[in-house]
Each structure stands twice: as structure tokens, then as C-alpha cells.
Design a protein with these regions (language model features):
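C-terminal ends and interior cores of transmembrane alpha-helices
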Residues: 181-195
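Multi-pass alpha-helical transporter architecture, strongest
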Residues: 71-83, 277-302
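Hydrophobic core of transmembrane alpha-helices in multi-pass small-molecule transporters
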Residues: 1-18, 22, 120, 200-215
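Helix-to-loop junctions at the C-terminal end of transmembrane segments
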Residues: 55-57, 158-172, 260-261
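Juxtamembrane intracellular "pre-TM" segments in multi-pass secondary transporters
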Residues: 82-118
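Helix-loop boundary and gating motifs at the non-cytosolic
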Residues: 111-149, 217, 253
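Loop-to-transmembrane helix entry
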Residues: 32-42, 62-65, 138-157, 200-201, ...
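A membrane-interface helix-boundary motif in multi-pass transporters
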Residues: 54-70, 258-283
């Protein structure tokens, strides 16, 4: 099972950056149009969470079967996407092109380097949420946690639709900083909330997902597209995804797993307050350093 899961991940994860590149290639104003397209993926996430939660499928193999079928349908649907030939079509292809090394030229820009490093570092504490929130809510006694977590995606829809307005009013740096602060805030809410009088803190922590995801991930993808331009758009998106959703998530999985294990209670369960304070602190440190060093560069037109 595990080798098959790894194989699936190797096939699927690159499509996250690829779909961004294809989308940006067909847009005249990505900062305005991309959120309207990306929000459909959020709706799909909500549907999946509601199905799993409402039908009580969380501890069964049914979600994996549903995912397998949906992946097959998605693969077939991809054949109907608009024709998007490589910008270097008909030109000699070098090893540098195949490996996407042109994206490394963006690192000459100090602000882009700061953005990439900050995004990579923030993705380490992010894994605490993705890997352990469901377990946390289960151990806290919240019923149907998978369904409750879709509240985060519901808030994501609203913030996704409003993202172009926020970008216009606040700019990339402020939006990214708000997104980073939201991650720290949600972990603090999880640390001190409970399923009794302070249950509102848990719900608020979940609802912050709209700010956490849209203001950090989606804004980062739009910023990367602006800095890269059409020629190295795909390479830049792939480079960002590799460092964040690849290396960052991998390190985050090991770090979060080790922290959660170290706070296991012998009688059963975990010391969640101390667990959540770890990623909260990490996010705050990244936020402060990013605020000092990040200076958005002028948009490129190449």
C-alpha cells in the first residue's frame, strides 16, 4: 500500500504547479481571474469533507476508493483542457530547460529569495494542521470533525472571491503577512480552546483557514507568476511547489510527527496545548523575519 501511495503522490503533486501554470497562461489579469478559478477546487474539497464526515467514512477505506475514482475522472477530463503548448516549442531543448533551472534566476532578486525561503519555512509548521487537526478534534470530543473542518473551506470561498480586492487595497506584502499571522493565530486558538465554554476558539481556528490559505498560498502563486513572466512561468511555479509542498511539507511531516509523539500522554491522548504552541511559535518567528526582509520587487513584463 505505502509504495503505491508514494507512486500516486509522485504523479499527483507535480500537477498542483502545472494547473497553476496552465491557468495563468490563459489569463489576461491573473491577480483578478485566478481566485475565481481556484475557488472551484475549494468547493470540491468541501464536498469531499462533507461526504466523508456525514457518512462516517473517516476510519474506512471508502475515501481512498472515492479518491481513486475521482482521479481517473480528473485524468480523462484533463484531455479536454485548452491547448497549451510550451513557450519553447520548436526550439532546441536543453537539460537546463528540462530541469526548470531557469527559475533559479529569480533568486537574484533578494525579495523573491526572501519570499521563497519564508514560504518554505512556514510550510514546516503548516503540517501540524494538515496532519493532526482531525486527530486533535477527535480527541477533544468534537463530533464529525471532517465535516466541521469544511467550515475552513467555506470561509476560503469568501476570501478567495475577495482576494483581488484585498490585493489591490493592501498589496502583496501585507496580504502575505496577514496570512502568516493567521497561521500563528489559529494554532494559539487550538492551544487554548476546548469543546466546552471555549469551543468558539476551535471554530474560529478552523474558520481562519480562508485567510491562512488564500492570503499565503494563492497570493504567493500570483506573486510568483508576476515575477516570472510567461517564459519561465511553469518552471517558477514548479520550483515554488517543490520547496513548499515538497521539501517543506516533508520536513514538516517529520517535525510535527516527532513533536506530537513527544507529547503523548501515557494514559492515552496528547498534550495538545504544548503541541500547538510549537507551530505557533515557529510561525511567529517566520513572520517577524519576513516582515523585516521582504521588499516586493517591481512586476516583471518578460
Amino acid at each position: 500500500f505505502y509504495p503505491v501511495l508514494i507512486g500516486y503522490g509522485l504523479c499527483y503533486m507535480p500537477t498542483l504547479a502545472l494547473t497553476n501554470s496552465i491557468s495563468f497562461d490563459h489569463m489576461k489579469d491573473p491577480s483578478r481571474e485566478f481566485p475565481q478559478i481556484r475557488v472551484l477546487g475549494t468547493i470540491g474539497w468541501i464536498v469531499a469533507g462533507l461526504i466523508v464526515g456525514r457518512l462516517g467514512l473517516e476510519v474506512t477505506a471508502v475515501p481512498l476508493r472515492i479518491a481513486a475514482g475521482a482521479s481517473l475522472v480528473l485524468g480523462l477530463f484533463s484531455l479536454s483542457l485548452p491547448h497549451t503548448p510550451p513557450h519553447a516549442a520548436g526550439k532546441p531543448l536543453s537539460a537546463r530547460d528540462v530541469l526548470g533551472l531557469d527559475a533559479l534566476s529569480l533568486l537574484r532578486d533578494r525579495s523573491f529569495t526572501t519570499f521563497v525561503v519564508g514560504s518554505f519555512l512556514l510550510c514546516i509548521p503548516l503540517q501540524f494542521y494538515y496532519a493532526f487537526t482531525n486527530l486533535f478534534l477527535n480527541e477533544s470530543g468534537m463530533g464529525e470533525p471532517a465535516s466541521k473542518m469544511t467550515l475552513g473551506q467555506m470561509s476560503e470561498i469568501g476570501f478567495m472571491v475577495l482576494l483581488p480586492w484585498f490585493l489591490f487595497r493592501l498589496g502583496v506584502k501585507r496580504i502575505l503577512l496577514i496570512g502568516m499571522a493567521a497561521w500563528a493565530g489559529r494554532y494559539a486558538l487550538f492551544a487554548y480552546g476546548d469543546t466546552h465554554d471555549l469551543i468558539w476558539m476551535l471554530y474560529l481556528g478552523i474558520l481562519l483557514h480562508g485567510v491562512c490559505y488564500d492570503f499565503f498560498f494563492v497570493t504567493g502563486q500570483i506573486y510568483t507568476d508576476e515575477q516570472a513572466g510567461p517564459r519561465i512561468r511553469a518552471a517558477a511555479q514548479g520550483f515554488l511547489a517543490f520547496l513548499t509542498q515538497g521539501v517543506g511539507y516533508l520536513i514538516g511531516a517529520y517535525v510535527s510527527g516527532a513533536i506530537v509523539k513527544s507529547y503523548t500522554i501515557p494514559a492515552g491522548g496528547h498534550d495538545w496545548r504544548h503541541i500547538w504552541l510549537v507551530p505557533a511559535t515557529m510561525a511567529v518567528v517566520v513572520l517577524v523575519v519576513f516582515a523585516v526582509l521582504f521588499r516586493p520587487a517591481v512586476k516583471r513584463e518578460t
